[in-house]
Amino acid sequence: MMLKHHFTFEKDWRFAPAAFWVHIPTPNTEREFAPPAPEPIPHKGYAFLHVEVEGVDLQFSAPAQLDHFIEVLRRKPLPTSRQLSSKRGLALGPNGHWLSRLPAKLKAPRAREKMVRVLREVRAKVVGTGSDIAFNTSAFM
């Protein structure tokens, strides 16, 4: 499986497809999330990891999103988007969940196994040691 990855910088970390489903607002706060939301890089914005898999651009604005993506895709059987969206506790339908937007060719068991293996390798390269909150973009700039 050919895999390429790079970083871009965006205005808002919430633009990543998994951001809404991973970072849950802490009650009675405006800007606190569990897991923590990423911090912007001064004068650049929020680092977005782009991973190209089988012609599909996967985007992540925080290591927690990448970890969640890997964790979901490694499950056997693959959970449904309805099961995953119900965990958010809101009346949002499963059609808006990132898993429902993932192309079918990437949901096949063998494709998922390969993708999880490679995404773990990418994670080892782009997540700084000692911090699971931010990507290490310095090696790629």
Model-assigned labels for residue ranges:
Residues 24-141:
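Domain-scale terminal segments
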Residues 1-22:
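N-terminal cysteine/histidine-rich coordination modules
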